[in-house]
Amino acid sequence: MTKIAFTGGGTVGHVSVNLSLIPTALSQGYEALYIGSKNGIEREMIESQLPEIKYYPISSGKLRRYISLENAKDVFKVLKGILDARKVLKKEKPDLLFSKGGFVSVPVVIAAKSLNIPTLIHESDLTPGLANKIALKFAKKIYTTFEETLNYLPKEKADFIGATIREDLKNGNAHNGYQLTGFNENKKVLLVMGGSLGSKKLNSIIRENLDALLQQYQVIHLTGKGLKDAQVKKSGYIQYEFVKEDLTDLLAITDTVISRAGSNAIYEFLTLRIPMLLVPLGLDQSRGDQIDNANHFADKGYAKAIDEEQLTAQILLQELNEMEQERTRIINNMKSYEQSYTKEALFDKMIKDALN
């Protein structure tokens, strides 16, 4: 029986593709295990949503593009992570490793290479992240979500496969969503998602604008961990730090979304044809990948995008009003999108690429 090790973490986007592929592997009779960080969001997501598979925590350090004393400390964490991962891989003896990226994936990929375990990696963003750039040196193949990403990668290793969407995404139950929120079915719902880390500025602007927003919408506000404000209580407004199992039901009642610009989330909204206002992480918080993503989807006519540093209470309302006026056009543009690979087709490709 073929056994597959999965890795990836640090943000929801570095886990979501794995959450789609692991059930496919299990349904086809393969064994699966997960290697992630000790305290990252991937551990919480995997252990809660896929409790039937083994989760192995390893040491991991952050990879930085700038000079910092923390880099020296994290070198030792990465080295420890390689040893941790080797120990797991020698014990489990997987036939292949699938890496979704993120800092924790690098020591796992290096360990797999040292044991001659073929590795496939996945890049969701328009331009490759630092972790995947390093991991690619030790991997057999890299799959890309955007066709344009191939321009940044060696041709012999890179394949465009498009977005991989969770199977349960389209199975959200609107009745359950209304029951969960207590919302009125006859009024539009706005979902605000600041990403797995949250956005203090976006949260502040939403709360500042709440009375104006509630005139047009009912608002579901995913604030990010530790950023919920218990003092803000209004009819038609509900806050969560983070939603796991119920997210598909909330998406089923969502008419419009304000979101960070991680590509996995964007493709989910695109699949569900939910008009989106994208507020990407700025260059002060990231390498600019979300800015590239947001501009790409805005250029396609699937979304509107605004830089967080330009965002004000007035501009937010203005952008939402413009998007509502263009709702029909945006949704029609979204209808032109077609998924390149189903998760089953991608899984079959993985097995063929890794083991042949």
From Swiss-Prot:
<keyword id="KW-0132">Cell division</keyword>
<dbReference type="GO" id="GO:0009252">
    <property type="term" value="P:peptidoglycan biosynthetic process"/>
</dbReference>
<dbReference type="Pfam" id="PF04101">
    <property type="entry name" value="Glyco_tran_28_C"/>
</dbReference>
<keyword id="KW-0131">Cell cycle</keyword>
<keyword id="KW-1003">Cell membrane</keyword>
<comment type="similarity">
    <text>Belongs to the glycosyltransferase 28 family. MurG subfamily.</text>
</comment>
<protein>
    <recommendedName>
        <fullName>UDP-N-acetylglucosamine--N-acetylmuramyl-(pentapeptide) pyrophosphoryl-undecaprenol N-acetylglucosamine transferase</fullName>
        <ecNumber>2.4.1.227</ecNumber>
    </recommendedName>
</protein>
<dbReference type="GO" id="GO:0008360">
    <property type="term" value="P:regulation of cell shape"/>
</dbReference>
<keyword id="KW-0808">Transferase</keyword>
<dbReference type="Pfam" id="PF03033">
    <property type="entry name" value="Glyco_transf_28"/>
</dbReference>
<dbReference type="GO" id="GO:0071555">
    <property type="term" value="P:cell wall organization"/>
</dbReference>
<keyword id="KW-0133">Cell shape</keyword>
<comment type="function">
    <text>Cell wall formation. Catalyzes the transfer of a GlcNAc subunit on undecaprenyl-pyrophosphoryl-MurNAc-pentapeptide (lipid intermediate I) to form undecaprenyl-pyrophosphoryl-MurNAc-(pentapeptide)GlcNAc (lipid intermediate II).</text>
</comment>
<keyword id="KW-0573">Peptidoglycan synthesis</keyword>
<dbReference type="GO" id="GO:0030259">
    <property type="term" value="P:lipid glycosylation"/>
</dbReference>
<keyword id="KW-0328">Glycosyltransferase</keyword>
<keyword id="KW-0472">Membrane</keyword>
<dbReference type="GO" id="GO:0005975">
    <property type="term" value="P:carbohydrate metabolic process"/>
</dbReference>
<comment type="pathway">
    <text>Cell wall biogenesis; peptidoglycan biosynthesis.</text>
</comment>
<dbReference type="GO" id="GO:0050511">
    <property type="term" value="F:undecaprenyldiphospho-muramoylpentapeptide beta-N-acetylglucosaminyltransferase activity"/>
</dbReference>
<keyword id="KW-0961">Cell wall biogenesis/degradation</keyword>
<dbReference type="GO" id="GO:0051301">
    <property type="term" value="P:cell division"/>
</dbReference>
<dbReference type="InterPro" id="IPR007235">
    <property type="entry name" value="Glyco_trans_28_C"/>
</dbReference>
<dbReference type="GO" id="GO:0005886">
    <property type="term" value="C:plasma membrane"/>
</dbReference>
<feature type="binding site">
    <location>
        <position position="196"/>
    </location>
    <ligand>
        <name>UDP-N-acetyl-alpha-D-glucosamine</name>
    </ligand>
</feature>
<feature type="binding site">
    <location>
        <position position="166"/>
    </location>
    <ligand>
        <name>UDP-N-acetyl-alpha-D-glucosamine</name>
    </ligand>
</feature>
<feature type="binding site">
    <location>
        <position position="290"/>
    </location>
    <ligand>
        <name>UDP-N-acetyl-alpha-D-glucosamine</name>
    </ligand>
</feature>
<dbReference type="InterPro" id="IPR004276">
    <property type="entry name" value="GlycoTrans_28_N"/>
</dbReference>
<dbReference type="InterPro" id="IPR006009">
    <property type="entry name" value="GlcNAc_MurG"/>
</dbReference>
